[in-house]
Structure formats: structure tokens, C-alpha cells
Amino acid sequence: MHLNTLSPAAGSKTAPKRVGRGIGSGLGKTGGRGHKGQKSRSGGKVRVGFEGGQMPMQRRLPKFGFTSRKSLVSAEINLYEIAKVEGDVVDLSALQAAGLVKKNVLFVKVVKSGEVSRAVTVKGLRATKGAREAIEAAGGKVED
């Protein structure tokens, strides 16, 4: 076998359509675009969501809700993630140093998901009732 004898398998490659190259090609004259109209013109596209002048769906439906700005500075952390924090005291700066919450976060809540394996002191963070019980069961404590 030589490199100059290699060729793709039969039927695996399709030749590109040669549009507008004579009537005999089957794609000459109008080039598969039909006659006249917006879609036959160059650059003739209809915007996504355009319904021909009818009031579009995204404008017919009412607006709802908003994004709370508090969510930008709040975060949740799971119990099993506390194990990634070095030291016995888990507070906001320790979580940021471990890369578990972003730098702009001001409020963190510990959620019971997974389990905590060692005794830790959670300082200055909010905790759910289940998370608080799990931390205390492991010999740790939660300080507000």
C-alpha cells in the first residue's frame, strides 16, 4: 500500500452542489431558490422568531420574575465540601481560600448533602437544621 493509492470509501464523500452553473446541471438559473420573494434574494433571511408581521410569541407572552441581586453575593455549600477546607475552623475566608466560593460572595449557607467526617467549627455561616445536626454529630459546632 502506498500513500498515493489511498482513497476514501465509496459513498463516504459527497460532492458539493455546484449551484447556478447552467440549466443542464439541474441547479442552474434560480439555483434551487425558486422564483422571486425575500428568500430568493442575496442576504434574504428572515429573523429568528419573525412571524410575518404577526405579534411574535416572545412579545405575546407576559414578562415574569426577576433576578435577585442578593443571589449574586450568596452561595450554598454542601457538607462533603467542608472536608476540602484545611484547618478546624470553616469561615467565609477559608472557603474562598479553598476555592469553594467566589471572592464576591458575602453570605454562605451550609446545606446537608453528604456527610462530614471530622469535627469542624463553622463560624459566621448560616446552616440548615440538618446540616447543623450532622456537624454536631461529628463532634463539631456551629457558631453564628
Curated annotation (Swiss-Prot):
InterPro entries: Ribosomal_uL15 (IPR030878), Ribosomal_uL15/eL18 (IPR021131), Ribosomal_uL15/eL18_sf (IPR036227), Ribosomal_uL15_bac-type (IPR005749)
GO cellular component labels: cytosolic large ribosomal subunit
Coiled-coil region: none
Gene Ontology terms describing biological process: translation
Annotated stretches, region: Disordered: 1-52
Cysteines paired by S-S bonds: none
Function as written in the Swiss-Prot or TrEMBL entry: Binds to the 23S rRNA.
This protein's name: Large ribosomal subunit protein uL15
Natural source organism: Pseudoalteromonas translucida (strain TAC 125)
